[in-house]
Amino acid sequence: MNYFPWLTIIVVFPISAGSLMLFLPYRGNKVHKWYTICICILELLLTTYTFCYNFKMNDPLIQLSEDYKWINFLDFYWRLGIDGLSIGTILLTGFITTLAILAAFPVTRDSRLFHFLMLAMYSGQIGSFSSQDLLLFFIMWELELIPVYLLLSMWGGKKRLYSATKFILYTAGSSIFLLIGVLGISLYGSNEPTLNLELLANQSYPVTLEIILYIGFLIAFAVKSPLIPLHTWLPDTHGEAHYSTCMLLAGILLKMGAYGLVRINMELLPHAHSMFSPWLMVVGTIQIIYAASTSPGQRNLKKRIAYSSVSHMGFIIIGIASITDPGLNGAILQIISHGFIGAALFFLAGTSYDRIRLVSLDEMGGMAISIPKIFTMFTILSMASLALPGMSGFVAEFIVFFGIITSQKYLLMAKILIIFVMAIGMILTPIYLLSMSRQMFYGYKLINVQNFSFFDSGPREFFLSISSLLPIIGMGIYPDFVLALASNKVESILSNYFYG
């Protein structure tokens, strides 16, 4: 057990510092913005320092563990810890949240509440990734939903209340299944009920019970990931949310579902996961081609990017379902990779909206000459999204492909069929991404409109774009930077399976 509460400080600091902002006298929007940015930078530096000096990459066990009795009556503990599976997502959360708050500089209405909600969401997300207690994981999972709902309903487009209501109905409804799974898995014990994830990982269950628990957790995580057909909240939410909120949704929130699938479904319920993995493989494959074929029909810019996120999440599901070392490593790399790519694309879509106040691709055109910096960055990040060699998406998808090929669980014809359908999806991806760029930046529609003034990317926007792009290129050139963090944990998880 760790004697200094590093993780507790990292989890509690953002929401605590954000709460102070609500009670301090109003000093103007700029003060609140810079205060929030300083909090995020300090949090990111503290997280990086803690992990650099206290995390051992060759140890697959839980590190920096903290275990404090919280509620005696319920035998409830505040258990935190990290391993190779969670360290990457925690660092991703810190990086994307800092960029999202910097991107939210134009927000002036209810600035104090807006930035407090962003910080509360930050704490909930880090708490979910570092929880080593099932009930604490559930509480953090729910804590993160409240700020998202308020951010959607108060700052967004004309249909923001509809999209916020749809979001909360889907996620709150799925949380019921998560709670049932948490109670079921914790109450069944050989000696006494436990919520400790480390102890639960070494526990076996009757096959029927394991299947029931697996389905409950799967529904909860399938909504958040999202998996088809439980994805319909995502395009509406992204289409109406402020682009800084979209950055957090695409960059972090979707990854929580994939993280839960690995942390709970795959690690705690290996027999059920082995039984359900072929179905997950089918769903992931269909998801890639479904989203890639549906996306070109979306006339709303942000909805089209949202469908690209659905397609990319299909690769993560396939990697998890492959039950192989390369497949799971590729899925983890894709989680980090798409976190940066998705957040960056939504940011650039938002900066375009700030200039022209349009989201319909049919009304756009001809912006490349007036805003060459934004055009260049959007083109590069579109290439990253379609998995151009040299970018992180290419490496992640290639490793997932390799994981399918080397899997001993599936027959040769099944693997050939899966790879063939995935390849079709990858061919469709450039069609909807490049056509999106063509509709936005080429042609003469907006150039011929009078009283339209364009201004190119400013220093803040250019810094945000470059900050998102550099990790994408870095992981594309040297993916071992991410893979080395999780490799030992992946081997530990796969040791519960008889093939791989």
From Swiss-Prot:
Q: How does it sit in the membrane?
A: Multi-pass membrane protein
The Enzyme Commission number assigned here is 7.1.1.-
**This protein's record includes keyword Thylakoid:** yes
Where can this protein be found?
Answer: Plastid, Chloroplast thylakoid membrane
GO process annotations (BP)? ATP synthesis coupled electron transport; electron transport coupled proton transport
The protein's enzyme class: translocase
Q: Which residues cross the membrane?
A: 4-24, 35-55, 87-107, 113-130, 134-154, 167-187, 211-231, 242-262, 272-292, 305-325, 330-350, 386-406, 416-436, 466-486
Q: Which InterPro entries match?
A: NADH_Q_OxRdtase_chain4, NADH_Q_OxRdtase_chainM/4, NADH_UbQ_OxRdtase, ND/Mrp_TM
Q: What is catalyzed by this enzyme? A: a plastoquinone + NADH + (n+1) H(+)(in) = a plastoquinol + NAD(+) + n H(+)(out); a plastoquinone + NADPH + (n+1) H(+)(in) = a plastoquinol + NADP(+) + n H(+)(out)
Give an example GO cellular component term for this record.
chloroplast thylakoid membrane
Protein biosynthesis in keyword set: no
- NCBIfam families, per this entry? NDH_I_M
PANTHER family xref list = NAD(P)H-QUINONE OXIDOREDUCTASE CHAIN 4, CHLOROPLASTIC (PTHR43507:SF21), NADH-UBIQUINONE OXIDOREDUCTASE CHAIN 4 (PTHR43507)
Q: What is this protein called?
A: NAD(P)H-quinone oxidoreductase chain 4, chloroplastic
Corresponding gene?
ndhD
